[in-house]
Amino acid sequence: MSGKDIVLELLRRWGSQQSQGMSVEFVDANRQLPIAYRNTIANMMAEGEALNGIFAADEITYTWYERKGIRDLPYPRIAAGEGATFDIDETLSLDEVRPMIAKPFSPGNAFAAEEVARERIQFDKALIGSCTNGSYDDLLQAALVIYNAREKGLRKATRTFVVFPGSGGVARQIERPDPRLGGESIAEVFRSIGGQIRASWCGPCFGQGPDALAKGERAITSFNRNWQNRMGVGGEGYLASPAVVAASALAGYMAPPSELGLPWDPDVYGI
């Protein structure tokens, strides 16, 4: 389960109207969502046509800053006041969230990845990155899938597999060893199955550069939107979490890690 799965499930439920023109506040009641998940969810409120999406700062936020050596924040905490009213008050139990894949041509056109896997949808490219899923933790989750899949003999991506780190800092960080990968770096794990690491930019997310989709091509991506012609004129983009994209690259068709014999285990794949 990831932030991408959560937001695709929300957009599936809401359709194209519920959050249109709204400000959306998310409350992580159990304080369990890491910043990478929150970033993905809030970022993709643009795809819900909302004015904005926010998580009020809490101890998870402050801990994230402290780990980066930032303790004195220049702005006060912003949160809804006690008398705030909401046009819609909705609860989503994370127990209801499964790995998801959004089909063309809307992020809300989302389905359980296990159901999509039964269709054996073929594709040309598996692409990980974008402002919604290019953080170190996003890439680590994908690398953990590959790392554990290699133990099952899956050692080669069956399709073009390209990764776009979310920033120059992330690009440098993924070259360093990570203990959760047995001392390998994320980049080494990606390259071990034939993955390619690109510069940090939007690229095919908005149909630019050599990795953009050509007419008739299809890609499964961790990008934020899959509108018609978005990733390249005449191409078809599907949306999923980095973990699902990595699993699909190994499987050769769109599928969650469970299709590789890797059921979700928060102790193994959680970030």
What is the meaning of each model-derived region?
Residues 1-271:
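Fe-S-dependent hydro-lyases/dehydratases of central metabolism
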